Structure formats: structure tokens, C-alpha cells
Amino acid sequence: MIIQTKYHGEVKIKEEQMINFSNGIPGFLDQKQFVILPLSEESPFLVLQSLKNAELGFIVSSPFLFFNQYEFDLDETVVEILEVEDANDVEVMVILTMESSIEKTTANLRAPIIVNRKNMKAKQVILHDSAYHTKHLLEVASSC
């Protein structure tokens, strides 16, 4: 399947690469199918690209690359929705707001994206009782 993307133009993807958000993403409830693409070969950043809207591509990354102490408990309801059987099948990503320099780039740690890589079901989870916010500066020194 060939899709149009925000950052890479036309890209060929396989059906098994498609990630399904059954309820969409907050603010984009009609966008239910995405694919994860590398931003570039050397970059730790990825693109969560909508299959339906070429202009909708979020820059994402593993939070653990920049925030060593990042942790939260995944609600049992989310585990059931995503049909998680093994914690090793779960991938956690956070949406980044890219700025002019990496030192000014922020991560939304309040609303991580959880992907079950076994069945490709995903959900953006809002951590209500959390010390995390929507704009945490990346801890660049710890990732270098």
C-alpha cells in the first residue's frame, strides 16, 4: 500500500505495519489508522503518521531515551482494550513538540501512546493522577 506522508512524501507500507486506534487520538477522533516511520536514519525520533490524512504526522519518541525515571501504571481497562498478554509486547511513545533546537523540544509525558506490537492496537492514555505534564523539556544530556 502506498500512502502520502507529511515528512516523506509517498511511502510504501505493509498492512502489518498499520496501528489501529479504535477510538482515534484525543483531538483527532476520526483518525484511527496510523503507521510509525523513522524521521531519518540517524534520528531517535519517529513519525506517527495518519493513513487517512497526509498532513497529520506526530513526531514521537520513546520517553525512556530522554527520561530514565519515567514510569506509570497502566490501567487494567487499557490492558483489556489493547488485549495485552505480555508486557514485552507493549511499546510506549510520547508526542514531542519540536522547537528550533533540541534543548527547547518538549515531550508530552502526561499522555503517552501505548502500542501492543503483537496485535497493533494502540491508545493514547491520559495520566490523570500524575506529576507529569504535557511539556517536559527533553533531558538531552542523559541521552547523549
Swiss-Prot record:
Transmembrane segments: none annotated. GO terms for biological process: bacterial-type flagellum assembly; regulation of translation. Its main location: cytoplasm. It is found in: Cytoplasm. Belongs to the FliW family. Acts as an anti-CsrA protein, binds CsrA and prevents it from repressing translation of its target genes, one of which is flagellin. Binds to flagellin and participates in the assembly of the flagellum. This is Flagellar assembly factor FliW. It comes from Bacillus pumilus (strain SAFR-032).
